[in-house]
Design a protein with these regions (language model features):
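A generic local structural motif
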Residues: 54-58, 88-90, 190-192
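Solvent-exposed, flexible loop/coil residues
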Residues: 44, 56, 63-64, 112, ...
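Structural alpha/beta surface segment adjacent to cysteine/selenocysteine redox centers
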Residues: 73-76, 81-162, 196-199
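Alpha/beta-hydrolase fold active-site loops
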Residues: 67-68
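C-terminal cap of thioredoxin/glutaredoxin-like
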Residues: 1-39, 72, 160-226
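Conserved short-loop catalytic and cofactor-binding motifs
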Residues: 57, 106-109, 145, 174-177, ...
């Protein structure tokens, strides 16, 4: 009887260990499961305009001004953050706040899959309320992580929006983000970039002309030469 009981307990012990191992493997697999991101290759953008589609882009300054500055950008691009901090700040002070020019932001999410999610989130906020876009843009650049890290994930974006844009309809934003309601707009921006032979970010145009020197002085010279 003792041997029989010992055998039963031994089998039960093995079963418990195996169940534990399976649970650990299952939980580990769930924890390491990669987050899914929008796939622009599968998106039909419809008709793509010949120009920059300015009337549908977020802008700063005076849209009636004769000077139109367009930037193609990726939220994960370190050079884009630097350009925003050093050049856009000066352009805003010199031209945009004075009503002498308009600045348009166009998405070119090419660095990583979460670049596309970041662009989609910005577009989704813009469609809910145009005033929500620029706080999002500023905060995403200020809190930019390492280019090779998938920091622009849904959790990061939802927290950033919840903590910093108090008037947003958060449930609507999350639903539209999950359903990728405005992904065609992001794809359209990407195709506009391709049409203008944009091969990196930041790329800047002044009145339709690609500016090679995108320092403040270079852009000022391009404006002065119009």
């Amino acid at each position: 009887m003792k041997k029989k009981h010992f055998g039963i307990w031994w089998l039960c012990g093995i079963a418990v260990v195996l169940i534990g191992i399976l649970l650990v493997i299952n939980l580990s697999g769930q924890g390491n499961k990669a987050e899914s991101y929008p796939d622009l290759e599968k998106v039909d953008a419809g008709a793509v305009p010949d120009g920059f589609d300015e009337e549908n882009q977020p802008y700063l300054g005076n849209p009636e001004a004769p000077v139109k500055i367009v930037e193609f950008s990726d939220y994960k691009c370190p050079a884009c953050k630097q350009w925003k901090d050093q050049v856009l700040t000066e352009l805003k002070r010199e031209y945009l706040d004075a009503g002498k020019a308009a600045f348009y932001y166009v998405d070119m999410p090419f660095l990583a899959p979460d670049s596309t999610l970041a662009a989609l989130a910005g577009e989704t906020l813009y469609q809910q309320n145009h005033d929500f876009f620029w706080p999002y843009f500023d905060l995403m650049m200020e809190q930019q992580g390492k280019k090779d890290d998938a920091w622009a994930n849904k959790g990061f974006i939802m927290k950033l929006v919840k903590d910093n844009i108090p008037d947003v309809d958060l449930k609507r934003f999350e639903r539209e983000l999950d359903e990728e309601i405005y992904i065609a707009n992001v794809k359209r921006d990407f195709l506009i970039a391709e049409n203008h032979k944009v091969d990196g970010t930041p790329t800047v145009f002044v009145n339709g002309q690609n500016v090679e020197d995108i320092s403040f002085e270079g852009i000022k010279a391009a404006i002065d030469n119009l």
